[in-house]
Amino acid sequence: MKKETVLWAMLATTTCVTAQNGKIPTSGVSADSVLTEKDSIKADKEAEIQAVTVTGHRPMYKMRNDALVTRIRNTPLAKEPTLEDVLKHIPDMKQTADGSLEVNGLGAPTIYLNDKKATSAELSHLDVKLIDEIELITTPGAKYDATTGAVLRILTRRTEEGIFGKMQVYDKLSEVNTNHEELTLGWVTKKISLTGFYGYTDNRYNVHQPQEALVRAKDGEYLFGTDRHGKNKANYNATELNFDWLISKQHEVGIQWEGLWLNGGRSEKQQQYYRYPNPAGEDTNSEMKLSDADGEMKYFDAESQQWGHQRSHHINLFHLAKWSKHFSSQIYLDYARNKDSDSQPITEKEGSEMQETLNRSNSNYDIYSGRIEVKQLISDKHSINYGGEWSLMEGKGKTESSADMLGTTEYKNHDTKTAAYLQYQGGVGKWNWWVGIRYEHLTSRYTNLSEKSPDNMERHYDQWFPSFGITLKEPSWHHSLSFRTTTARPSFRQLSGNIYYTSRFQYQISNPKLQPVNTYRLTYSVQWKDFMGMLRYTRIDHSIMYVHEVPEDKPVRYVSTFMNFNKIQKYMAYLNWGHVFGCWRPNAHASITYQRFSVSDHGELISYNGATWDASFDNYFTLPNDYQLSLSYSFDNGGQVGKTKFHPTQNWSLGANKSWMDGRLQVAFSANDLFHQQLFKERTHEHAVDFSQTEDYKLWSYKLTVTWKFNKRKGRYNGMNSAEDELNRL
């Protein structure tokens, strides 16, 4: 008995539980932990222990079917102040050059909140403590839009009745200061939920972006460079109103309105330089350094101001019905209007010469969409899901420039999309599976209203998107194999046919002839105890990338545009491990992706084969009295991505938070990129141009967040935003 008592005491010590006078503090005890409690443990007098509680923690990450599930409730992630802070700690999520988050190799995920597509306002004021778990689905089923690469499903707790509210403010300091304030108020009864939200953000950041292009033209080599320093400012005013009415146990309806007012500006100073080929008969030194130019390098200064305004409104209606025990339906209707405009005066000075350019643009879009989903239960383990959606987007815009070769372009866009899907889900014993098919028809019409050079185009796409998944769950193992096809349609900016002024030596040209990108992915996932792994094969057809060219018929030395490329193949492997050692929760993650891709560029075969790998190590420390600390490190070797080769980056970050008054008041501090090592250096080699640049968005920051809750309830709104995909394209 003595040995057993000592063992229990050691376990209690390693789990950071303190036993004092036979009583154990219960703050922070997980309701979802595996709890073993002995009311009385009789030990020898020498042990002097009257009672011990031993808590075994469930893992923070696990596999469910073909999804990676991150538990939030009663884990250290529940104490993160915002959803963005939580998403940084989900395995396979990466931070991009501008600070946004994406899924490794799959781009930005589509986010669902309780099975409805979430809006940006909803996510900005979501209370992290009300989240149960987050599913990362890298092979979504047929019900999801074909443009969706990955899905994040956020599942929250059920609502409680009463009046609730939350105020949150944060201040983020880097080279400049960003602040945010928000207020959420609501009232919930058994039948009705009414919620209102207002948020204001004053977002500021500086950018340093040096770039250089070595251009190989028929008459020799040109060198163009820019050292760009930008100061950015944007003011966001976001509002949201939700009304949800549970008419009966079988029917629920609701309406949501969102509004966004954005005013922003960018002030930029540049020092540009250039070097023309040596005159005939002189040697051209392609390795010439700037300091060795001996007067052959020319310099000039440029300044620009860019001011933008955006106004958008979005209305969502929904009806949820349960017609019988085995049959249910969901209907969503949306209307959105988006209006934006911007102006950009540019001044370039070289000696006593000065050149001024004014660029302006505006656009207006209306979006109408609807979606219906039906679920038919065949038995406990077998069901059929089917449905359809329709959307219409109409818009017009205008771009104008005082530059001689640009002039004015007026255009119209008209897009209609019709889609239908069917998916079957079933299971027997340890096996579960699903198989689905999705059909999408898209008509895209672009009309150039310019009388001088009309460039009108109408395209029709009819595509089928099959998908399937199968899982095997055993006591210690979990296996999953899944397949999905997706598409990525060009953005309106890429298709518009417009020409954008960058500098006197460079223009950016859109390409109305771009084709959609088609992607095919086969994924195998496995979990064994604390380890999770993944193998993925990806084939990409008609990939869209930047290219730099030297036109012969225009008075400019090089232009950048978009172009479709042939097949890219990627092979990805990923491993994650996490465990709980008392108050310490470490989690380690590593992945590697090898790319096979080559291009025939004006008769030159260029290989872009190469690998990229990354690793991260997160640590959470749960301390007494509701204190929590975190320390994270990540490394990314950059590697080859498409045609671009990136340099390595790394990031050290830490956080600390403390709660009072049963969690109603929370103060959180975080520091990101402590040693300023997130500089994204990239280089691209093409037949005509070697291009390199550094993107320094000053991602290092210190952030203080204060949250006060009137109580812990939340509003209920079960509508789905069926227009979110089209809004994102804008």
Model regions and ranges:
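Outer-membrane beta-barrel signature, preferentially recognizing the C-terminal barrel domain
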Residues: 412-415, 456-461, 487-541, 559-571, ...
